[in-house]
């Protein structure tokens, strides 16, 4: 259910605020970033993010809901064909507000609001996880034949152990001789 926004309206009346937000959103989707006053940017952020969420869904009903607010069909086309699919794997946080220096004429606080074009940390972590898994897949495939060979190696292992025991016994036998040589030298 639509509820009126609290506080003073941007531009004076509610109809002017609706038109103002629609025009700001149109400019944002057309250019990717806009410079405006900080209160306008803060009011635009949830408005634009809801429109992007509609664009992610992509249904005809969602397109008509967006067309109620944004009258430029070219911008709506860009929103649904480029911006919406770009944010398909992102849950919110489509815009960023960066404070900039105040406006020179009236010292109004200014901000830049822009669409976030970088990949998310989680998507990069997912990519790293997939790369790691793909590297493990060949290792696992190589380990599977080795696992099949290991039982044969275990059966063949007692035969080599017997010759290895002989050199150990030979190494153990000269030690008393070495001790005997050492004691005779004293």
From Swiss-Prot:
HAMAP family noted in UniProt: Ribosomal_bL17
Give the keywords, sorted: Ribonucleoprotein, Ribosomal protein
Ranges for the region named Disordered are: 123-186
- A GO CC annotation given for this chain: cytosolic large ribosomal subunit
List GO molecular-function terms, semicolon-separated. Answer: structural constituent of ribosome
**What GO biological process terms does the UniProt entry carry, in alphabetical order?**
translation
Q: Which Gene3D superfamilies match?
A: Ribosomal protein L17
Q: How does it assemble?
A: Part of the 50S ribosomal subunit. Contacts protein L32.
Which Pfam families does the record match to this protein?
A: Ribosomal_L17 (PF01196)
- Write down the species: Mycobacterium avium (strain 104)
User: What gene is it encoded by?
Assistant: rplQ
Q: What is this protein called?
A: Large ribosomal subunit protein bL17
Domain of life, per UniProt, equals Bacteria
Q: Ranges of Low complexity compositional bias? A: 139-177
Give the protein family.
Answer: Belongs to the bacterial ribosomal protein bL17 family.
Q: InterPro entries of this UniProt entry?
A: Ribosomal_bL17, Ribosomal_bL17_CS, Ribosomal_bL17_sf
């Amino acid at each position: 259910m639509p509820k009126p926004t609290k506080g003073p309206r941007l531009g004076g009346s509610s109809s002017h605020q609706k038109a103002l937000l629609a025009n700001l959103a149109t400019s944002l989707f057309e250019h990717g970033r806009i410079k405006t006053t900080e209160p306008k940017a803060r009011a635009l952020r949830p408005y634009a993010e809801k429109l992007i969420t509609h664009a992610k869904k992509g249904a005809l009903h969602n397109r008509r809901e967006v067309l109620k607010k944004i009258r430029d069909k070219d911008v709506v086309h860009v929103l649904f064909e480029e911006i919406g699919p770009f944010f398909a794997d992102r849950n919110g946080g489509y815009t960023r507000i960066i404070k900039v220096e105040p406006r020179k004429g009236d010292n109004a606080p200014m901000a830049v609001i822009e669409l976030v074009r970088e990949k998310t940390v989680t998507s990069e972590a997912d990519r790293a996880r997939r790369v790691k898994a793909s590297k493990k897949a060949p290792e696992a495939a190589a380990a599977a034949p080795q696992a099949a060979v290991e039982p044969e190696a275990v059966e063949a292992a007692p035969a080599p152990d017997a010759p290895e025991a002989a050199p150990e016994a030979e190494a153990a036998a000269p030690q008393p001789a070495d001790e005997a040589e050492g004691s005779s030298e004293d």
